[in-house]
Protein backbone atom coordinates (compact mmCIF):
# COMPACT_ATOMS: atom_id res chain seq x y z
CA UNK A 1 0.00 0.00 0.00
CA UNK A 2 1.11 3.57 -0.59
CA UNK A 3 -0.07 7.14 -0.69
CA UNK A 4 0.36 9.47 -3.62
CA UNK A 5 2.33 12.69 -3.30
CA UNK A 6 2.30 14.99 -6.27
CA UNK A 7 4.09 18.30 -6.37
CA UNK A 8 2.99 20.56 -9.21
CA UNK A 9 5.03 23.72 -9.28
CA UNK A 10 4.21 27.04 -10.89
CA UNK A 11 7.46 27.31 -12.79
CA UNK A 12 7.95 28.16 -16.47
CA UNK A 13 8.44 24.47 -17.20
CA UNK A 14 5.41 23.47 -15.06
CA UNK A 15 7.44 20.66 -13.55
CA UNK A 16 5.62 17.90 -11.73
CA UNK A 17 7.15 15.34 -9.38
CA UNK A 18 4.65 12.54 -8.73
CA UNK A 19 5.76 9.89 -6.27
CA UNK A 20 4.34 6.91 -4.45
CA UNK A 21 5.40 6.79 -0.81
CA UNK A 22 4.75 3.76 1.42
CA UNK A 23 1.79 4.32 3.72
CA UNK A 24 3.21 1.97 6.37
CA UNK A 25 6.22 4.23 7.03
CA UNK A 26 4.73 6.64 9.56
CA UNK A 27 5.79 7.95 12.94
CA UNK A 28 3.49 5.37 14.54
CA UNK A 29 5.43 2.54 12.88
CA UNK A 30 8.89 3.91 13.73
CA UNK A 31 10.54 2.30 16.74
CA UNK A 32 12.77 5.08 18.14
CA UNK A 33 15.26 3.13 20.22
CA UNK A 34 17.87 5.70 21.26
CA UNK A 35 16.42 8.31 18.87
CA UNK A 36 13.68 9.78 21.06
CA UNK A 37 15.23 13.27 20.98
CA UNK A 38 15.49 13.17 17.18
CA UNK A 39 11.87 12.05 16.85
CA UNK A 40 10.74 14.84 19.18
CA UNK A 41 12.72 17.42 17.18
CA UNK A 42 11.17 16.28 13.90
CA UNK A 43 7.65 16.41 15.26
CA UNK A 44 8.30 19.82 16.79
CA UNK A 45 9.42 21.20 13.41
CA UNK A 46 6.28 19.80 11.78
CA UNK A 47 4.02 21.34 14.43
CA UNK A 48 5.41 24.84 14.16
CA UNK A 49 3.93 27.31 11.69
CA UNK A 50 7.23 28.81 10.54
CA UNK A 51 10.24 27.34 8.77
CA UNK A 52 12.58 24.86 10.42
CA UNK A 53 15.53 22.81 9.26
CA UNK A 54 16.92 19.43 10.34
CA UNK A 55 19.77 17.47 8.80
CA UNK A 56 19.65 13.76 9.59
CA UNK A 57 22.46 11.35 8.80
CA UNK A 58 22.97 7.61 9.12
CA UNK A 59 24.17 4.65 7.13
CA UNK A 60 21.87 3.24 4.47
CA UNK A 61 19.04 1.16 5.86
CA UNK A 62 18.99 2.82 9.28
CA UNK A 63 15.56 4.40 8.77
CA UNK A 64 16.24 7.92 7.51
CA UNK A 65 13.91 7.54 4.50
CA UNK A 66 11.24 6.12 6.83
CA UNK A 67 11.33 9.33 8.86
CA UNK A 68 11.04 11.54 5.77
CA UNK A 69 8.13 9.44 4.50
CA UNK A 70 6.52 9.79 7.93
CA UNK A 71 6.92 13.57 7.87
CA UNK A 72 5.37 13.76 4.40
CA UNK A 73 2.48 11.55 5.51
CA UNK A 74 1.76 13.63 8.60
CA UNK A 75 1.60 16.96 6.79
CA UNK A 76 -0.15 15.67 3.67
CA UNK A 77 -2.88 14.18 5.88
CA UNK A 78 -3.38 17.68 7.27
CA UNK A 79 -3.89 18.95 3.75
CA UNK A 80 -0.50 20.66 3.46
CA UNK A 81 1.54 20.60 0.25
CA UNK A 82 4.71 18.56 0.60
CA UNK A 83 7.62 17.60 -1.64
CA UNK A 84 9.83 14.53 -1.39
CA UNK A 85 12.97 14.39 -3.54
CA UNK A 86 14.86 11.04 -3.45
CA UNK A 87 18.26 11.92 -4.89
CA UNK A 88 19.20 8.26 -5.25
CA UNK A 89 16.61 8.35 -8.06
CA UNK A 90 17.79 11.65 -9.51
CA UNK A 91 17.80 10.22 -13.05
CA UNK A 92 13.99 10.46 -12.89
CA UNK A 93 14.06 14.26 -12.83
CA UNK A 94 16.23 17.36 -13.25
CA UNK A 95 17.52 19.93 -10.71
CA UNK A 96 14.88 22.42 -11.88
CA UNK A 97 12.27 20.32 -10.08
CA UNK A 98 13.32 22.22 -6.94
CA UNK A 99 12.18 25.53 -8.47
CA UNK A 100 9.21 26.87 -6.51
CA UNK A 101 9.42 24.36 -3.66
CA UNK A 102 9.90 27.23 -1.21
CA UNK A 103 6.11 27.66 -1.47
CA UNK A 104 5.42 24.21 -0.01
CA UNK A 105 4.82 23.49 3.66
CA UNK A 106 7.49 20.79 3.73
CA UNK A 107 10.41 19.81 1.51
CA UNK A 108 12.25 16.53 2.14
CA UNK A 109 15.53 15.89 0.31
CA UNK A 110 16.68 12.31 0.76
CA UNK A 111 20.19 10.90 0.17
CA UNK A 112 21.99 14.16 -0.54
CA UNK A 113 25.29 12.26 -0.73
CA UNK A 114 24.17 11.01 -4.15
CA UNK A 115 24.71 14.44 -5.73
CA UNK A 116 27.99 15.36 -4.00
CA UNK A 117 30.23 16.78 -6.71
CA UNK A 118 27.34 17.42 -9.11
CA UNK A 119 27.55 21.16 -9.72
CA UNK A 120 24.02 21.61 -11.06
CA UNK A 121 22.34 19.73 -8.23
CA UNK A 122 24.48 21.35 -5.54
CA UNK A 123 23.64 24.83 -6.84
CA UNK A 124 19.94 23.98 -7.10
CA UNK A 125 19.85 22.79 -3.48
CA UNK A 126 21.84 25.82 -2.32
CA UNK A 127 19.46 28.19 -4.10
CA UNK A 128 16.41 26.40 -2.68
CA UNK A 129 17.86 26.62 0.83
CA UNK A 130 18.31 30.38 0.43
CA UNK A 131 14.78 30.84 -0.94
CA UNK A 132 13.39 28.87 2.01
CA UNK A 133 15.31 31.10 4.41
CA UNK A 134 13.78 34.15 2.73
CA UNK A 135 10.24 32.75 2.73
CA UNK A 136 10.37 31.83 6.42
CA UNK A 137 7.51 29.36 6.01
CA UNK A 138 8.82 26.09 4.58
CA UNK A 139 10.12 23.25 6.73
CA UNK A 140 13.21 21.57 5.25
CA UNK A 141 14.41 18.07 6.11
CA UNK A 142 17.56 16.66 4.50
CA UNK A 143 19.21 13.28 4.94
CA UNK A 144 22.68 12.04 4.11
CA UNK A 145 24.98 9.16 4.91
CA UNK A 146 27.42 11.38 6.82
CA UNK A 147 27.61 14.82 8.48
CA UNK A 148 27.42 17.86 6.15
CA UNK A 149 31.12 18.72 6.43
CA UNK A 150 32.08 15.20 5.31
CA UNK A 151 29.92 15.08 2.16
CA UNK A 152 32.74 16.06 -0.22
CA UNK A 153 30.56 18.76 -1.74
CA UNK A 154 32.07 20.88 -4.47
CA UNK A 155 30.19 23.98 -3.30
CA UNK A 156 31.60 25.15 0.07
CA UNK A 157 28.66 27.50 0.64
CA UNK A 158 26.24 24.57 0.47
CA UNK A 159 28.24 22.63 3.06
CA UNK A 160 28.14 25.71 5.28
CA UNK A 161 24.36 26.09 4.87
CA UNK A 162 23.73 22.42 5.66
CA UNK A 163 25.79 22.80 8.84
CA UNK A 164 23.67 25.67 10.18
CA UNK A 165 20.62 23.94 11.62
CA UNK A 166 19.85 21.00 13.87
CA UNK A 167 22.00 17.99 12.96
CA UNK A 168 21.21 14.52 14.23
CA UNK A 169 22.76 11.11 13.78
CA UNK A 170 20.14 8.37 13.57
CA UNK A 171 21.41 5.88 16.12
CA UNK A 172 21.32 2.20 15.13
CA UNK A 173 18.90 -0.06 16.95
CA UNK A 174 20.13 -2.63 19.43
CA UNK A 175 19.03 -6.23 18.92
CA UNK A 176 16.37 -5.78 21.59
CA UNK A 177 15.09 -2.67 19.81
CA UNK A 178 15.09 -4.52 16.49
CA UNK A 179 12.92 -7.21 18.06
CA UNK A 180 10.53 -4.55 19.36
CA UNK A 181 10.48 -2.88 15.93
CA UNK A 182 9.62 -6.18 14.25
CA UNK A 183 6.85 -6.92 16.72
CA UNK A 184 5.46 -3.40 16.28
CA UNK A 185 5.45 -3.79 12.49
CA UNK A 186 3.68 -7.15 12.86
CA UNK A 187 0.98 -5.70 15.15
CA UNK A 188 0.35 -2.86 12.72
CA UNK A 189 -0.11 -5.46 9.98
CA UNK A 190 -2.61 -7.35 12.12
CA UNK A 191 -0.65 -10.34 13.39
CA UNK A 192 1.61 -11.29 16.28
CA UNK A 193 5.30 -12.13 15.98
CA UNK A 194 6.24 -14.53 18.80
CA UNK A 195 9.36 -13.50 20.67
CA UNK A 196 11.17 -16.76 19.93
CA UNK A 197 10.50 -16.37 16.21
CA UNK A 198 11.72 -12.78 16.27
CA UNK A 199 14.95 -13.76 18.02
CA UNK A 200 15.42 -16.60 15.54
CA UNK A 201 15.16 -14.12 12.64
CA UNK A 202 17.71 -11.82 14.26
CA UNK A 203 20.07 -14.73 14.77
CA UNK A 204 19.81 -16.23 11.29
CA UNK A 205 19.27 -13.24 8.97
CA UNK A 206 21.01 -10.05 7.96
CA UNK A 207 20.14 -7.63 10.78
CA UNK A 208 19.63 -4.64 8.49
CA UNK A 209 16.09 -3.44 9.22
CA UNK A 210 14.98 -3.15 5.61
CA UNK A 211 15.86 -6.82 5.07
CA UNK A 212 14.12 -7.84 8.28
CA UNK A 213 10.95 -5.94 7.39
CA UNK A 214 10.87 -7.45 3.90
CA UNK A 215 11.26 -10.90 5.42
CA UNK A 216 8.46 -10.17 7.88
CA UNK A 217 6.18 -9.21 4.98
CA UNK A 218 7.11 -12.45 3.21
CA UNK A 219 6.31 -14.50 6.30
CA UNK A 220 3.01 -12.69 6.82
CA UNK A 221 1.94 -13.52 3.27
CA UNK A 222 3.07 -17.14 3.63
CA UNK A 223 1.26 -17.49 6.95
CA UNK A 224 -1.99 -16.21 5.47
CA UNK A 225 -1.67 -18.43 2.40
CA UNK A 226 -0.91 -21.56 4.42
CA UNK A 227 -3.26 -20.55 7.26
CA UNK A 228 -0.53 -21.36 9.76
CA UNK A 229 0.81 -19.44 12.72
CA UNK A 230 4.38 -18.19 12.72
CA UNK A 231 6.58 -20.77 14.39
CA UNK A 232 10.28 -21.48 14.04
CA UNK A 233 9.70 -24.69 12.02
CA UNK A 234 7.34 -22.83 9.67
CA UNK A 235 9.84 -19.96 9.27
CA UNK A 236 12.62 -22.45 8.50
CA UNK A 237 10.42 -24.06 5.87
CA UNK A 238 9.48 -20.79 4.17
CA UNK A 239 12.95 -19.23 4.27
CA UNK A 240 14.71 -22.54 3.57
CA UNK A 241 16.96 -22.18 6.58
Swiss-Prot record:
Keywords annotated in UniProt: DNA replication, DNA replication inhibitor
Q: Name one Pfam family in it.
A: Bac_DnaA
Report if keyword Ribonucleoprotein is assigned.
Answer: no
Task: Give the superkingdom in one word.
Answer: Bacteria
Please name every pair of cysteines joined by a disulfide bond in this record.
Answer: none
InterPro entries, per the entry: Chromosome_initiator_DnaA-like, DnaA_dom, Hda, Hda_Enterobact, Hda_lid, P-loop_NTPase
One GO-annotated biological process of the protein: negative regulation of DNA-templated DNA replication initiation
Q: What does this protein do?
A: Mediates the interaction of DNA replication initiator protein DnaA with DNA polymerase subunit beta sliding clamp (dnaN). Stimulates hydrolysis of ATP-DnaA to ADP-DnaA, rendering DnaA inactive for reinitiation, a process called regulatory inhibition of DnaA or RIDA.
By sequence similarity, the record places it as follows: Belongs to the DnaA family. HdA subfamily.
Q: PANTHER family this protein is in?
A: CHROMOSOMAL REPLICATION INITIATOR PROTEIN DNAA, DNAA REGULATORY INACTIVATOR HDA
Subunit and interaction comment: The active form seems to be an ADP-bound monomer. Forms the RIDA complex (regulatory inactivation of DnaA) of ATP-DnaA, ADP-Hda and the DNA-loaded beta sliding clamp (dnaN).
| HAMAP family (alphabetical) | Hda
What's the name of the protein? DnaA regulatory inactivator Hda
Lineage here is: Bacteria, Pseudomonadati, Pseudomonadota, Gammaproteobacteria, Enterobacterales
Amino acid sequence: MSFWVEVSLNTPAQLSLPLYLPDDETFASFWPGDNASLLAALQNVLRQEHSGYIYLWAREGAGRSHLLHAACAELSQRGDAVGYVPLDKRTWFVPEVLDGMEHLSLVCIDNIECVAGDELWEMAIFDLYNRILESGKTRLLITGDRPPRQLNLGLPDLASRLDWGQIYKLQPLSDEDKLQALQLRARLRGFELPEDVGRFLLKRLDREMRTLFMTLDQLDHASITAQRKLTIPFVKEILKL
